Amino acid sequence: MGDWSALGRLLDKVQAYSTAGGKVWLSVLFIFRILVLGTAVESAWGDEQSAFKCNTQQPGCENVCYDKSFPISHVRFWVLQIIFVSTPTLLYLAHVFYLMRKEEKLNRKEEELKAVQNDGGDVELHLKKIELKKFKHGLEEHGKVKMKGSLLRTYIFSIIFKSICEVVFLVIQWYLYGFSLSAVYTCERTPCPHRVDCFLSRPTEKTIFIIFMLVVSLFSLLLNIIELFYVLFKRIKDRVKSRQNTQFPTGTLSPTPKELSTTKYAYYNGCSSPTAPLSPMSPPGYKLATGERTNSCRNYNKQANEQNWANYSTEQNRLGQNGSTISNSHAQAFDYPDDTHEHKKLTPGHELQPLALIDARPCSRASSRMSSRARPDDLDV
């Protein structure tokens, strides 16, 4: 058997760029195929032709009978099978090496452009193009190649080709000599004078190895199928996830903590706020001076809107921002549906008036003495 170290070193590099199923497949290939084929199987088939005997003295009869019984040696057949099955993996490895070389070139070019940028050159467009190329080839992480794009397609192609090779070689093996060996082979072929019987050495041992290699081939085929479905499922999942991210971006507008902490937009009439469940209510003893009031929560929306405009106008006047103050006449009239009343809109003659707070409580004596504001019933001194 030849030296398998060169093929082993190449396949060992694929471990860093394979999925979990691919790593298991490589382990099966190394341990149960190459190792067993290089040690036990070769010694079992070492005397294959020399121990093949026929009950005839006719020169050349044994050679033609051996050629008819075994068109190709089992050992050489399995060597060809390993080579063909490993070829797609080697092609995938070649693609990985190509991307790594591409990354080295892009990194050198990027360093040159950054040096030009440090000198004051405008190379932002070229740097962005290099970043796009790295992202396209899956090179956005330094020193690691991501399985995406063309590399992912190459990997899927390698899995499919490996599976096809496994099936084809199993069919060929079954067609040539089946999955077991007989102790006696009958041969009737020129230059044999008549039908002769030929005998094979250690047929049971060889049959065991044939079944073992058959099981390993079926197991490798199963691993390839599982890995193929895993890669395809992951690819579909990533596409659906990326599509959802594009349709529903995570960056939604939300109120700032400053806006949430302000209490200038109050809600009254005993109805809770639609956005903030714990909104400040009116102080006890105070009432809103509104036109017509109902107990329906639908009217609360209209009153809250009027109160908000009044508060906003008062704050603008207090800050002294003349010219930007919004008068009540600019407030838009909102229609609120009601099941029992008709929709009413504000007419130009009925403008919204600021909501005033009416003190329904009598002032205490202490507050009267402490207050420095003149009252109508105060005595003139």
Curated annotation (Swiss-Prot):
Disulfide bonds join 54-192, 187-198. SUPFAM superfamilies: Connexin43. GO terms for biological process: bone growth; bone morphogenesis; caudal fin morphogenesis; cell communication; cell communication by electrical coupling; cell population proliferation; cell-cell signaling; embryonic heart tube development. Its main location: membrane. GO terms for molecular function: gap junction channel activity; gap junction hemi-channel activity; voltage-gated channel activity. Residues 317-381 are annotated as: Disordered. It holds the Pfam family Connexin. Gene3D superfamilies: Connexin43 (1.20.5.1130), Gap junction channel protein cysteine-rich domain (1.20.1440.80). Keywords: Cell junction, Cell membrane, Developmental protein, Differentiation, Disulfide bond, Gap junction, Membrane, Transmembrane, Transmembrane helix. Belongs to the connexin family. Alpha-type (group II) subfamily. This is Gap junction alpha-1 protein. It comes from Danio rerio.
